[in-house]
Amino acid sequence: AENLPAYRLELVPEKVNDLDGTIQALGRIIDLPEDALEKFQKNRSRHRVFDSVPLKFNLTEAEVARFAVDRHNFAGVEVVPYLARHYPYGELMTHVLGYVGRLDENDLRRVDAGNYRGTTHIGKSGIERYYEDQLHGLSGVEQIETNAQGRVLSVLERQDPEHGDDLILSLDVQVQQAAWDALGERAGAVVAMDPRDGSVLAMVSKPSFDANLFVHGISADKFREILNAPDRPLFNRALLGGSEPGSTFKPFVGLAGLELEVITPDKQVFSSGNYYMPGGSRPYRDWKKGGHGWVDIYGALEQSVNTYFYQLAYELGIDALHGYLTQFGFGDRTGLDLLGENRGVLP
């Protein structure tokens, strides 16, 4: 994520004689969508008297130029430069980085509102939200004395702002891109970790969406389109989805069998290609037609023999297996520094 220079249109309602007429006149030189006007009215209610209220973000160069020509006709209205959040990797990183969006009443209830005076955006999801306090820093304050015309006479008090922290992530863009490409057109998730320290090198959830759409305020129509898409691009499959662990689960079952002395390293089980629960008639199949023959734990792991681990899990029993697997974090959250992670399911 990076910050890029941009311009926003804002006004001080108390300094505008005819607010409705002024907004209509502004609409003739600057495109003001209905969504922007609705957000302006909502923002007015939470701003203090004589505070500037944003009317539109991310003005085009043409809009800035047109306003500059007619600026003398708009008392109390200003075009203000600011730094806008930009996500150069677009949808590739959205589900892990998250995004910032317009500050609203719900946001103010979870932060120190006094530290967000003059702030228009806040972390809404992902890394941006989890580390909001560190990234935001401290707002500056300046108390001034003015005359009746609004001219500054003196500065009574000043507290300089403090820059937020920079974050260096463990993510590797090349690994992230490789994971993204590997999924192709399929919906799914890929997480790549460094086994030496558990750091996350890639976290992909697909399909995704472009976080830049939310920075300046997404239109209601566009949001409905994304929200109602059948492939659910807003759903973070890496963080919220539940998937069977597949054969990656087998080493843990094998280790449980060894440590609880249900098997020995040289105990062999015959794999015929099908496994039947005692008293049952439903076959649970091996991946290899005809099975693998006699295998011990080494061969079962090497060849990923399904039937060996079906039998071992049955001999362990659900209570012993459950108790052992909880030691490895199955059925719990990982503690990843992202909000909203679901727990795993462990019978």
Walk through the language-model features, giving the residues of each.
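Extracytoplasmic/periplasmic proteins that interact with beta-lactams or build/remodel peptidoglycan
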Residues: 1-189, 204, 208-237, 242
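Beta-lactam-recognizing serine transpeptidase/beta-lactamase-like catalytic domain environment
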Residues: 146-158, 195-248, 252-347
